[in-house]
Amino acid sequence: MVSFASTLPSLVSFIPSPSSITNASRNPPQPGMICCKFRSELNNEDRFHRRDILQSVGAAVGMDLIARSSAFIEVANAADLIQRRQRSDFQSKIKLTLYDAIKANPDIIPSLLTLALNDAITYDKATKTGGPNGSIRFSSEISRPENKGLDAALNLLEESKKVIDLDSKGGPISYADLIQFAAQSAVKSTFIASAISKCGGNVEKGTLLYSAYGSNGQWGQFDRIFGRSDAQEPDPEGRVPQWDKASVQEMKDKFKAVGLGPRQLAVMSSFLGPDQAATEALLASDPEVLPWIQKYQRSRETVSRTDYEVDLITTVTKLSSLGQVINYEAYTYPPRKIDVTKLKL
């Protein structure tokens, strides 16, 4: 007869409990021991099989490896949390810098929106090139007819980038990220301005209204798309319409080429030129776009403006990720090591 009585307890002991996982780094699990008793007086029917022994040994060793791996998982999770915190802190500094820059130059908002749109909508699905890659920063691209008048917006971001990079511990911000986050800040500024207007110009009440009923919580997915790569050369010409001269059909065709439709074209009206009312009047001439223009105009008259703001955020988020492979470790850095020998107890 073969006794594996000690095997089962050893298996159970290797299953990590929550407390053992927590203390894994301090008390690493010890290898288990499998004891077997053998009696010589066995008949053929009761005789043990070598395969049974190997299975028991394999199970015990496997559970031991699982327990040991818990310490590694704990370290990996801790590193991930540190990186998330680093990226979040850096992103907060970026937003604060852009907020201050836009607040001091509110007239630049329409150009910031168009700059982000024109940088992103160069995406070509067939070749998987273009997109929000910061290529619009190159002089040969920013000087194209469709980008006329956007120099001031780019110059503002250049100055903001100097401030941001000076305070960065994880490397300079990419132009691709900078341009899209500037558009986010610009959009938020228009949302807050609308709330203030609804409160008769009272800044405090308007800000409170936006905090209570606004769409600020809808930016989560956009914020996670952080770590875009910069292009090293301008995107090909002919991919961006001149919005002030293009027909509605041309606009629809361009939006369709990047996976967007009449609904998204309507909600992006503020990105197509400095005069949103004039742009919407043109878009309303198209029967496919008209219902969406009317829907968003009605939404903007409400207190919360939910339909308009949420759909705009969703569309901006999609545009800002076209063709990009996001580096989710961008802007992270090794944490400073603490010399415990110098600590005063």
From Swiss-Prot:
Location in or out of the cell: Plastid, Chloroplast thylakoid lumen
A GO-annotated cellular component: chloroplast thylakoid lumen
One Gene Ontology molecular-function label: peroxidase activity
Chief location of this protein within or outside the cell: plastid
GO biological process, one term: hydrogen peroxide catabolic process
Pfam families on file: peroxidase (PF00141)
Keyword Thylakoid: yes
Chain segments annotated as coiled-coil in the UniProt record: none
Keywords of the record: Chloroplast, Oxidoreductase, Plastid, Thylakoid, Transit peptide
EC number: 1.-.-.-
The keyword RNA-binding is assigned to this record: no
Annotated family: Belongs to the peroxidase family.
Protein name: Thylakoid lumenal 29 kDa protein, chloroplastic
UniProt source species: Solanum lycopersicum (Tomato)
Gene designation per UniProt: CLEB3J9
